[in-house]
Design a protein with these regions (language model features):
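The Walker A (P-loop) glycine that initiates the GxxxxGKT/S ATP-binding motif of P-loop NTPases
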Residues: 9
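Conserved glycine(s) of the Walker
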Residues: 14
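C-terminal lobe/tail of nucleotide-utilizing enzymes
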Residues: 200-217, 221-315
Length: 315
C-alpha cells in the first residue's frame, strides 16, 4: 500500500468512520499511522472521543496511532499572514497598507479556502509524515476534495507564468542599466524569484506525491444518489490523472435470519435486495473494484466497534 491513503466520497456516507477504522487496522498491524482530518466537521475527535488539534497527538487506547485535525479557518488566517509577511519584505512601505487591505478582501474569495487547506495537507505530507509509515486522510465531501486535488496542476501553470513575467521584468531592468550603473534588479538573489521557485517546487512535490505515492478510495452507500455521486467522482479523478484504487460500500443493511417472517423482516429483505442491485451496478459499471462491504451497526461506530469495522476493511 502507498504511504498516503485518501478516503473520499459524498457527505454523510461514513468517510470518517472508514478512515479511522482503516487507520486503527494499520496501527494494530504495527504500521505507525497518522490519521488527518481535512473536513471542517472534525468528526475524527468524535469517533475517538478525544479532542485533536493541528498537531499530531496519540490516540488513547490505540498504540502506534496519532491523529490531527486541520482547521480550515485557522489555516486560511495562517496562509494570509505568511503571504502578508512575505510581500511586506519585498515592496515599499507605502504599499504595505494596500496589500493588507487586498488580503483582507481575499479572505472570502472563491479558492482562498481550498488554497489554504491545500497548503496545510501538503505540508503534512512533506514535513510531518517522516515519523509515520502511513498517513490516512479523512477528506471533505467530494466536490471540495476534487478542487483541492486539482490545484497542483492549476497553480503550477500559474506559477510558471509568474516566473516567466518576473524574469522578463528583471531582464528589462538589467538591459536598461546605463554604463556602470547597477541595475535596480538582478536575476541572482531576487527574493520574488526565489519565493516563486519555492512555490513551484511545493506544487511539483504535491503533484508527484499524489500521482505516485498516494492511494485514493471512495466511500459510498448502497443508494442511487451515492452511486451517481461516486460515478462523477471517478470521472473527476480520471480528469486529474489520478486513479481511484477501490470503492468501499458502507452502511449496508444486515439481512434478517431465514426463519424471521414478520413485517420488519420483509422490509429488511426488500431493502437488502435493493442494495444488492445497487452494488451489482457498481461492480458492472465502475472500473475501480469494490474492495470492502461494511454493514450498519445498531450503535455508533466508536471504541471497540471501530476495531470490528476495521476487520472488514481488507484494503
Amino acid at each position: 500500500m502507498e504511504r498516503f491513503v485518501f478516503f473520499g466520497g459524498k457527505g454523510g456516507v461514513g468517510k470518517t468512520t472508514v478512515s479511522c477504522a482503516y487507520a486503527t487496522r494499520c496501527a494494530n498491524a504495527d504500521v505507525r499511522t497518522l490519521v488527518v482530518s481535512t473536513d471542517p466537521a472534525h468528526s475524527v475527535s468524535d469517533v475517538f472521543d478525544q479532542r485533536f488539534g493541528d498537531d499530531p497527538e496519540p490516540v488513547a487506547g490505540v498504540d502506534g496511532l496519532d491523529a490531527m485535525e486541520i482547521d480550515p479557518e485557522d489555516e486560511m488566517q495562517r496562509h494570509l499572514q505568511e503571504i502578508r509577511e512575505g510581500l511586506s519584505e519585498q515592496v515599499s512601505a507605502a504599499m504595505v497598507s494596500e496589500i493588507n487591505r487586498q488580503l483582507e478582501m481575499s479572505h472570502g474569495t472563491p479558492g482562498a479556502y481550498e488554497a489554504a487547506l491545500f497548503d496545510a495537507f501538503v505540508t503534512v505530507m512533506r514535513e510531518e509524515s517522516d515519523p509515520y509509515d502511513r498517513v490516512v486522510f479523512d477528506t471533505a465531501p467530494t466536490g471540495s476534495t476534487l478542487r483541492l486535488l486539482g490545484l497542483p496542476e492549476f497553480l503550477g501553470d500559474w506559477i510558471d507564468r509568474l516566473l516567466y513575467k518576473r524574469k522578463q521584468s528583471i531582464d528589462l531592468f538589467e538591459k536598461a542599466a546605463i554604463g556602470d550603473m547597477e541595475p535596480r534588479r538582478l536575476m541572482d538573489g531576487d527574493p520574488v524569484l526565489e519565493r516563486l521557485q519555492r512555490r513551484k517546487e511545493f506544487f511539483e512535490y504535491a503533484g508527484d506525491a499524489m500521482r505516485n505515492d498516494a492511494a485514493f478510495f471512495l466511500v459510498l452507500n448502497p443508494d442511487q444518489l451515492s452511486v451517481n455521486e461516486t460515478e462523477r467522482a471517478i470521472e473527476g479523478f480520471t480528469e486529474r490523472d489520478l486513479r481511484v484504487r477501490g470503492l468501499v460500500a458502507n452502511k449496508l443493511t444486515p439481512a434478517p435470519d431465514d426463519d424471521e417472517n414478520g413485517r420488519g423482516a420483509r422490509y429488511l429483505r426488500e431493502k437488502v435486495e435493493t442494495e444488492r442491485d445497487r452494488l451489482g451496478q457498481v461492480r458492472e459499471e465502475f472500473a475501480p473494484p469494490l474492495v470492502a462491504e461494511i454493514e450498519s451497526r445498531t450503535r455508533e461506530v466508536r471504541g471497540d466497534l471501530l476495531s470490528d469495522v476495521a476487520a472488514e476493511l481488507d484494503v
